[in-house]
Every structure is written in structure tokens, then in C-alpha cells.
């Protein structure tokens, strides 16, 4: 039986994520944002990656960002790099997988990072081992404006 829990968001992303992880019961936590899509190959390889590296506590997962409608003006304004595939800031590593240990916690109100671990490693930056993170320019601008209010 699954129990769904709702939490009021207080404008502090790390506090919110830390509250949610208290309900996790597995050996590892794989936390992705609502707008991120893991590649099926990544999902298939996770047991092998985790099993082959039992001493590693945290994994950084590469993320493919795409922004429909982005212009050279946006790229320059935000200091982004866009490759020939249209991927923004690739591999844009994200803290997404970690051992479920009470000392590993999120910090920072916005653009959160994990703390309380000793070992970490990046997952190789290939398309098949990445998260896909599609956006529109309208959504990106609204998100930037919202983050500026926090």
C-alpha cells in the first residue's frame, strides 16, 4: 500500500526535499525533478552501476537540457553553452542518486546540492545514461523570474 503525502512548499527547495526523503526506505534514493525524464538505458544500468561501486555514496547524473525557442540573445544573457545537438550546458551534472543515509542532506534554498557524504562519482556523460530535461523559452523565463523572488 502506498501512502501519498502532500507538503506545503515554503520557498526553500532543500528543506522541502529533505522532508520528502524522510519517507524513503530503500538503500538508495533516486530523486528527479518533475520535468526530468530518465533514459531507459540509464534505468536499466542503475543496478549494475550501484552494485559495482558499493563504497560510493553519491552519483552525479548527466542531464540533457533543451529549450525550445532559445535565441542567441538568451544564450549570451545567461552565459549558456549550446552544443551542435542543441543541448544546453551538457553534461550539466545533477545530484540525483545517493545512499539513503541520514547524514546526507540537501542544502541551499535554490539550486540545491547534497552535503554530508565522503565519496561521489559522475555517471558517464552519454545520451543513454542521461536525464532529458525539455523546456520552452517561456517556461525558462518564468522559472528564472520565480527563482529571483526566493
Which ranges hold each PLM region?
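Catalytic-site signature of metal-activated, phosphate-bearing donor transferases
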Residues: 11-21, 28, 39-150
Amino acid at each position: 500500500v502506498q501512502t501519498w503525502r502532500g507538503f506545503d512548499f515554503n520557498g526553500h527547495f532543500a528543506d522541502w526535499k529533505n522532508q520528502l526523503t524522510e519517507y524513503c526506505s530503500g538503500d538508495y534514493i533516486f530523486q528527479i525533478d518533475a520535468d526530468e525524464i530518465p533514459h531507459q538505458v540509464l534505468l536499466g544500468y542503475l543496478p549494475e552501476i550501484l552494485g559495482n561501486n558499493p563504497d560510493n555514496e553519491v552519483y552525479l547524473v548527466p542531464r540533457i537540457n533543451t529549450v525550445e525557442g532559445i535565441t542567441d540573445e538568451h544564450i549570451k544573457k545567461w552565459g549558456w553553452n549550446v552544443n551542435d545537438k542543441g543541448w544546453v550546458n551538457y553534461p550539466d551534472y545533477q545530484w540525483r542518486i545517493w545512499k539513503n543515509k541520514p547524514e546526507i542532506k540537501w542544502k541551499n534554498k535554490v539550486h540545491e546540492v547534497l552535503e554530508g557524504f565522503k565519496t561521489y562519482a559522475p555517471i558517464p556523460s552519454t545520451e543513454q545514461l542521461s536525464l532529458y530535461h525539455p523546456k520552452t523559452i517561456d517556461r525558462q523565463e518564468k522559472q528564472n523570474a520565480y527563482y529571483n523572488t526566493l
